[in-house]
Amino acid sequence: MHSNFFRLDQQVSIVTGASRGIGKAIALAHAQYGAHVVVSSRNLDACQKVVDEISSQGGRAAATEANISKKDSLESLIDFTLDRFGQIDHLVCNAASNPFYGPLSEIPDDAFEKILKNNILSNHWLASLSSRHISKSPSGSIVIVSSIAGLKGTPGLGAYAVSKAADMQLVRNLSIELGSQNIRVNGIAPGLIKTDFAKALWDNEEIRRHYENKTPLKRIGSPEDIAGISVFLASKASAYITGQTLIADGGITITG
């Protein structure tokens, strides 16, 4: 029994923003643990490369283009998954955007609206569109990738932080609403991870050294650090966990 705690065999996972970074690592990890994976992002060619990598390792996956800012595109993502694999067991809402760096008082309305739409509303849409299918799974789950930015005030990233705090509340509310359908809903709040999305932070030597010195584990994170948590939250090992956002930040939030 214990050897199967983390297996996802014959289950189907949708991962958004899966062409690179955390999303790619999550897609690869789900496939390595037996899931059939739908790899989605706006870049179909990049998604196909992830599918090819999964296939080369003996896994099964399919690529499709999806724009999280458009509800009809997400409807097509759900339809594609059902047409290709016939079921949905796990949804990982990883895709997000941050088009603005600076104080909230200076953010243009269109940039703020984009953040709210792509980081909050899209996750609501995906959960709503997929839940009636995930409810048919004996072990259905939804995971929303948030950020430790949603736990505290963050200079320069205020709008992004607001959206990520909202994602944590979305996790709590969805867990209550979907629990009776045997769907677990959880979040992951990464710290600084070495991805293109966060390159402006970790590629700055001064910022990176400050972060590493302040972090108990003395390093920034890797996409694989987050991928393992996503497998855990989809697997039997987390069967009694819902409504929680797991912090994966090397311990930096406990240092003040």
Report the location of each language-model feature.
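Short C-terminal tail/terminal secondary-structure segment
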Residues: 2-5, 101, 152, 230-231, ...
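Conserved glycine-rich cofactor-binding loop
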Residues: 12, 19-21, 43
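Substrate-binding pocket helix/loop in short-chain dehydrogenase/reductase
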Residues: 102-104, 108-116, 211
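Active-site helix of classical SDR
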Residues: 127, 163, 171
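Alpha-helical segment proximal to the catalytic Tyr-Lys
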Residues: 132, 176-180, 239
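Short, small/polar-rich loop/turn modules that mediate ligand/substrate recognition or access, typified
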Residues: 139, 179, 184, 241-243
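Residue(s) in the substrate-gating loop at a strand-loop-helix junction
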Residues: 147
